[in-house]
């Protein structure tokens, strides 16, 4: 009797890190034939898989040479890449998760795409439980700091929805909740950079999309000298790889780092 052929995609290219990390966590890394050059999680992925894309660009000919039966992308920023690959006859699935709930749904969906629905549900449930534990601990904090999270410095861009939600889970309050609902970065640009100072954040998180955050530069901005976060030295970098990647990293290391810093702020200001 001949063994049945695996009916699921066996040559997957991941254009962003979160799908790579998720497939590794599901034990499905053998299906991956190409990854993003920005991938750092898990570290061994960079050693094991060829890097075929940046974030808004890709080595299209190289991807075609890999003969993928599925390419996984993310958001409108990769729409042009996806369209060109489709024109070349390649199947593409583009996720568009912007919230914590949508990140969990993507994990479950990805499990279905590769035939490991049960493992994916278990992973998502574990991540959800971890978030609930942090939220429970945060509810016990005597104070909640006002938090400004900056994704980019020039122009100043405030945080996307999943980051805003994770700030809330971790024990803080995003000072720009109305902007967090905007899915596109261009719609989260602060028309007046001083508005962030006027909202008087107690804590500033900087995660400049791979560029090193400079607390000194933020503190030196005109009009910022009386901001509580500047006055108290509460300007903190959070690595982009653990918070701006809408996948397992943000729901584990990212939110834990936010919670740790917020907890330390509470201790200093109790």
Give the predicted meaning of each segment:
Residues 1-270:
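N-terminal ligand-binding lobe of clamshell/alpha-beta domains
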């Amino acid at each position: 009797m001949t063994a049945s052929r695996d009916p699921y995609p066996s040559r997957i290219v991941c254009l962003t890190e979160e799908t790579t990390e998720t497939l590794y966590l599901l034990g499905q890394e053998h299906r991956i034939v190409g990854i993003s050059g920005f991938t750092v999680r898990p570290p061994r992925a960079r050693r094991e898989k060829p890097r075929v894309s940046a974030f808004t660009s890709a080595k299209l000919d190289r991807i075609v040479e890999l003969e993928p039966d599925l390419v996984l992308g993310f958001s409108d920023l990769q729409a042009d890449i996806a369209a060109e690959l489709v024109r070349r006859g390649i199947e593409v699935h583009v996720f568009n998760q912007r919230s914590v709930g949508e990140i969990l749904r993507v994990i479950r969906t990805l499990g279905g795409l590769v035939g490991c629905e049960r493992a994916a549900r278990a992973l998502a449930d574990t991540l959800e439980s971890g978030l609930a534990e942090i939220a429970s601990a945060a509810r016990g904090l005597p104070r909640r700091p006002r938090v400004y999270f900056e994704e980019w410095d020039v122009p100043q861009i405030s945080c996307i929805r999943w980051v805003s939600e994770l700030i809330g889970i971790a024990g803080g309050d995003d000072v720009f909740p109305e902007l967090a609902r905007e899915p596109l970065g261009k719609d989260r640009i602060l028309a007046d950079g001083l508005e962030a100072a006027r909202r008087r954040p107690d804590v500033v998180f900087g995660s400049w999309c791979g560029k090193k955050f400079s607390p000194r530069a933020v503190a030196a901005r005109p009009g910022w000298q009386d901001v509580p976060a500047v006055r108290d030295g509460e300007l903190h970098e959070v690595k982009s790889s653990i918070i701006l990647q809408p996948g397992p990293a943000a729901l584990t290391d990212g939110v834990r780092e936010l919670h740790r810093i917020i907890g330390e702020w509470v201790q200093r200001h109790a």
